[in-house]
Amino acid sequence: MDNKLGLEIIEVVEQAAIAAARWMGKGDNKTADQVAVEAMREKLNQIPMRGRIVIGEGTRDEAPMLYIGEEVGICTRPDAEQFCRVEELVEIDIAVDPCEGTNLVAKGQNGSMAVLAISEKGGLLHAPDIYMQKLAAPPQAKGKVHIDYPPEKNLKIIAESLDREISDLTVVVMDRKRHLDLIRQIREAGARVKLITDGDISAALSAGFNGTGIHALMGIGAAPEGVISAAALRCLGAHFQGRLIYDPEVVQAGTYLPPVEETRRELKEKGIEDPDKVWECEELASGKEVLFAATGITDGDLMRGVRFFGGGARTETLVISSQSRTVRFVDTIHMKDGQQPRGLQLR
């Protein structure tokens, strides 16, 4: 799958990022998201595959494109036999976030990316559109920390695993009312807290790399983004655990959420027998082959955002493969048709 789809999915996230970046700093998060979705879908439909969106922009009633269950790729066309040989057909599940951090783009802030993860059919959990408690940590702490441990214990384990003091650690937490106690506990343990308004896929990813200055992600965010984070961290050999959160009193979202029993019933109808299960990243992204790709829209810990110049644009993309055990950083110059850039600089 890596050999067949690696370059294609790079182009998918690149085009989504370029489209969204045109709206960076313009205060219009909806349009930034819309153009990213359109660009990503157009590129996906040019790939020789039969893909199914398992995590996307919502249900078919909620989203006209990249909705859950939508089929994408050349091999989904009515005339697919002209382009796809059945014996070579690649069937995959796709999790997408064409513009993670739409508000970040609208405000011109750091941390927004165009993201997708793919695996063979059935290889990614079809996470419901609810919340998830998350714990992301470096590879050195994998299997040692646990989402049920108090923050102080996990921080001590991470510090020991990285051969440093707790006071050296930085933990990313989403700036939400529900996290006030978590933030207090992290600070009392001696670690530093980096509060973010959006973009916890980017934060989880940063925790999986050495040298980013981020050592953990803790707290509650969206469940679909948790599956995408799990796919990336599984490829990296890093730690990720998640637990679905559906109690309105815990989430404190400020919007309507169904009663607990109603959500539990719906989860069981979708095949999730234990709604309170702790999911390991190998369960959230269980496929034999998992591929993750992200292109920076705005600058982040790992990648620079899209930069425009007279003859085109420049992007930085991260591609991680569980199959080839590789991490690639791809620096791409996109030249407009019929134009030559005035001059290429190394950085």
From Swiss-Prot:
One Gene Ontology MF term: sedoheptulose-bisphosphatase activity
Name of the protein this chain belongs to: D-fructose 1,6-bisphosphatase class 2/sedoheptulose 1,7-bisphosphatase
Residues passing through the membrane, by range: none
EC number: 3.1.3.11, 3.1.3.37
Record: residues binding Mn(2+) 1: 33, 57
The protein's role, per its UniProt record: Catalyzes the hydrolysis of fructose 1,6-bisphosphate (Fru 1,6-P2) and sedoheptulose 1,7-bisphosphate (Sed 1,7-P2) to fructose 6-phosphate and sedoheptulose 7-phosphate, respectively.
UniProt cofactor(s): Mn(2+)
NCBIfam families in alphabetical order: glpX
InterPro entries with a match to the protein in the record: FBPase_class-2/SBPase (IPR004464)
Origin: domain of life: Bacteria
Oligomeric form and interacting partners: Homotetramer.
Native organism: Synechococcus sp. (strain JA-2-3B'a(2-13))
Reaction catalysed by this enzyme: beta-D-fructose 1,6-bisphosphate + H2O = beta-D-fructose 6-phosphate + phosphate; D-sedoheptulose 1,7-bisphosphate + H2O = D-sedoheptulose 7-phosphate + phosphate
Binding site for Mn(2+) 2: 97, 100, 225
Pathway the protein acts in: Carbohydrate biosynthesis; Calvin cycle
Family: Belongs to the FBPase class 2 family.
Key words, A-Z: Calvin cycle, Carbohydrate metabolism, Hydrolase, Manganese, Metal-binding
Gene Ontology biological process: fructose 1,6-bisphosphate metabolic process; gluconeogenesis; glycerol metabolic process; reductive pentose-phosphate cycle
